[in-house]
Amino acid sequence: VTDDATRTLGKGSAPPGPVPEGLIRLYSMRFCPYAHRTRLVLQAKGIRHEVININLRNKPEWYFTKHPFGKIPVLENSKCQLIYESVIACEYLDDAYPGRKLYPCDSYERARQKMLLDLFYKILGYQNTVFFGGDCISMIDYLFWPWFERLDVYGIADCVNHTPALRLWIAAMKQDPTVCALLIDKNIFLGFLNLYFQNNPDAFDYGLGC
């Protein structure tokens, strides 16, 4: 597994070579919540992968051959097959790779998790379970988590004070080894946002060495 904290590739950069056999490549950006979803699933399932970070203010010309609109995340395997859209990419990883399954095997429970995307805060309180999928972390928890991790960065962590079930869920998620492995320091995140809102292309490499 390669380090996610690599410098971005931008306009004028050479395209990466073929994906090595036995690996899957993730085109990502360290601060993107949608790419964060995919990184969580890769980490949770222990999938061997490499990360190519893309400068979203200064996208490489070649990247539009990976995604027609230049968006992230994108997965690419050694057969040059491309998978994009974060929920689809996460589902692909769960289906294509062995080991821990993050989506339930039961068809109804699988469908129910997908329906929760629009009803999450109501369902969690109603179910009386720690996690959205039950008593153990599952795919739906990882799909939600990136936005909740960012609440403190945006200065709105108190927006969940009136929802005890959500507060318990956030506390439980912060104990998960996968979540802990991908946490970004708040000050680094704030530094990124400061440069990002100045339209500074160096924002995407904030906090990395030269």
What are the language-model segments listed below?
Residues 59, 165, 186-191:
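Short amphipathic alpha-helical segments embedded in low-complexity Lys/Glu-rich regions
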Residues 1-128, 136, 200, 207-210:
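GST-like domain detector, emphasizing the conserved glutathione-binding G-site
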Residues 108, 112-184:
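GST-like fold's C-terminal all-alpha helical module
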Residues 188-210:
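C-terminal helix/juxtamembrane-tail motif
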Residues 11, 77, 184-185, 195:
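Generic detector of low-complexity/intrinsically disordered segments
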Residues 64, 154, 159, 194-195:
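A generic membrane alpha-helix/interface feature
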